C-alpha cells in the first residue's frame, strides 16, 4: 500500500512538472499575441470579405511578421490590402510585403522592423472566392475563421460572420476551444464567437447553414440536399464535445484530490519523522 501511494505521489509531481515546463516554454516566445479580431462579411456571390487584425507585443527585436490563409483548391484571394500600426500611432498602408502561394493557401509576409517592448497591429483585408456552397435546400459555410498553426497562444479572440441583413433559419456552430462562446443572432444577421487564452494549435472553426436566397448569385452549387446531414453531424459533434467537457472536469477533480492526498501525506510524513527521531543527549559538564 505504501509503495502504491509513493507511485501515485510521483505521478502527481510529474504532471505538475510537465505543466510548469510547458508554461516556461511558452514564455520564451519572442512575442505575445494579445488580440485577434477576425470579421467575415458574406456576399451574395458566395465569397467572403475578410478583415483580420492581429496585435503583437514583442519581447525582442524582429524584422517582420507573417500570416497564412489556408484555402481549398477552388478558392482564391483577391483585393489584398495590408496596414500596420506601431504602438498607438495611426495605421499606415504596408508597402513592403510578399505573398507566397503554398499547397495549403497564401502566405503573407510583412517586412516591418519592430523593437523590443513595442506593440504592432497588422490588418489584412482581402476577399476569399467560393467560400460558400449552395445546396438544393441550404447554403453552407464551413470555415476555419481562426487558424490553428500559431506559435503562441492568443490572449483575446473575437471572430464574427456578418450577413447583409436578418437571416431566418440561421444556424451556426463553433468548433475548437471548449471554453469559447458563440452567439447566433438571426435578427441581426450575425454570428459572434469569443475565446480567451486560445491555444495556438486549436483555432476556431465556424459551421453555419442558412437559406440559399442569401447567396443567390453563388456559382458554387451542389445539386443535392444537405441540411439534414449537417444537423445530424452537428448533433453528434455536440454530444462528443459534452463528453469531452465531462472528462475534463473529472480529471480536474482527480488532480485536486491527488494534490490534497499528496499534501496530507507530506504532513503525516513530517510528523512521523519527528516522532521517530533520536532524542539528543544532554551535555555533561566536567572539570579538568
For each feature predicted by the language model, list its residue ranges.
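Lumenal/extracellular ectodomains and adaptor appendage modules
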Residues: 2-4, 21-170, 174-268, 277-288
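Gly/Thr-rich phosphate-binding loop signature of adenosyl cofactor/nucleotide-binding cores
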Residues: 272
Amino acid at each position: 500500500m505504501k509503495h502504491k501511494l509513493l507511485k501515485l505521489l510521483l505521478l502527481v509531481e510529474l504532471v505538475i512538472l510537465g505543466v510548469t515546463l510547458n508554461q516556461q516554454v511558452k514564455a520564451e516566445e519572442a512575442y505575445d499575441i494579445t488580440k485577434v479580431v477576425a470579421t467575415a462579411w458574406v456576399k451574395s456571390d458566395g465569397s467572403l470579405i475578410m478583415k483580420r487584425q492581429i496585435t503583437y507585443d514583442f519581447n525582442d527585436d524582429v524584422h517582420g511578421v507573417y500570416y497564412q490563409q489556408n484555402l481549398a483548391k477552388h478558392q482564391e484571394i483577391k483585393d489584398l490590402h495590408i496596414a500596420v500600426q506601431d504602438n498607438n500611432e495611426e495605421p499606415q498602408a504596408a508597402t513592403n510585403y510578399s505573398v507566397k502561394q503554398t499547397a495549403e493557401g497564401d502566405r503573407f509576409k510583412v517586412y516591418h522592423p519592430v523593437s523590443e517592448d513595442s506593440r504592432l497591429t497588422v490588418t489584412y483585408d482581402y476577399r476569399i472566392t467560393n467560400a460558400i456552397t449552395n445546396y438544393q435546400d441550404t447554403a453552407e459555410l464551413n470555415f476555419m475563421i481562426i487558424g490553428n498553426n500559431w506559435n503562441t497562444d492568443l490572449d483575446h479572440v473575437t471572430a464574427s460572420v456578418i450577413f447583409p441583413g436578418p437571416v431566418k433559419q440561421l444556424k451556426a456552430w463553433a468548433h475548437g476551444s471548449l471554453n469559447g462562446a458563440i452567439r447566433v443572432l438571426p435578427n441581426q444577421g450575425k454570428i459572434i464567437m469569443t475565446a480567451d487564452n486560445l491555444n495556438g494549435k486549436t483555432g476556431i472553426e465556424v459551421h453555419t447553414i442558412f437559406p440559399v436566397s442569401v447567396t443567390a448569385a453563388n456559382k458554387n452549387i451542389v445539386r443535392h440536399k444537405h441540411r439534414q446531414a449537417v444537423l445530424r453531424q452537428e448533433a453528434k459533434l455536440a454530444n462528443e464535445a459534452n463528453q469531452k467537457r465531462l472528462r475534463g472536469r473529472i480529471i480536474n477533480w482527480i488532480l485536486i484530490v491527488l494534490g490534497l492526498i499528496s499534501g496530507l501525506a507530506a504532513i503525516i510524513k513530517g510528523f512521523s519523522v519527528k516522532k521517530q527521531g533520536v532524542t539528543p543527549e544532554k551535555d555533561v559538564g566536567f572539570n579538568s
